[in-house]
Amino acid sequence: MEIKNFSDFCTKVLPDFNQFLDQKLQTEIKQTTLRDAMLYSLDAGGKRVRPMLFLAVAYSSGVKFDDLSKYYDIAGAIELVHTYSLIHDDLPEMDDSDYRRGKLANHKKFGVGPAVLAGDGLLTQAFYLIAKSSLSTDKRMAAVRILSHNAGPMGMVAGQMTDITMEDKILSEAELTTLHKEKTADLITAAITIGAFSAGHELSTHLVQYANDIGLAFQLKDDLNDADDGEDDNKNTFPNLIGKEKTEEKLAALIKDALNAVLKENEFDKNLLVSFLDYFKE
């Protein structure tokens, strides 16, 4: 089977991956309230972009389609970390959001304490999934190293800290870029780089640049989508800092740079990652 389009890839892989992830938590988490709270946010309608990017890179690096299920543990770990971050991000002490993806935020559904524990459970269960993976020790160690680096205090957590402690300060463009890189882009970069390592593909600067570019582009797209609803009026966003038109130009430049970077990648099927860029045209 040869798949050239990212959307087609997700259509074929996502149902099986979702079933795998649900079954893992259903069977491994015995405390019912904790399990319900974890699954509530995990199954809240996310697109699974990060694990799908991980699997797409593995597939593009030569992993056969029928063997992709061997990589579900690592893909699942990436999604668990992402979901934990959303639960904690919505807490009253953070962004204080009552809704996520059209549903009550976890803390509004279960309470603040259970929501914190649900996030804690997802984060720690992620590394259990990696440890139990059937992949070789060196690949599992690479996944732990990259994911903990990019999602922890040297990456995503640092970005979140900057976000909540600098709310009353207008950040410079460089500071805002660093914030978005850490808070949003680093986990996307992790998904792509772990995908390459897991498939035995030698990581290049071109693939890293692609990952960094689309990671920042993700945040710009979200900022633009939210620019008209008024909710981000007092937040550090690129539309607020440089204007909507210049943000759109910056987004277009990032997508162009990402395309040029992945086209330089050698010994790698570029089709899925090139077609993924259509996401930013929606």
Model-found features: residue ranges?
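All-alpha prenyltransferase/terpene-synthase fold signal
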Residues: M1-E282
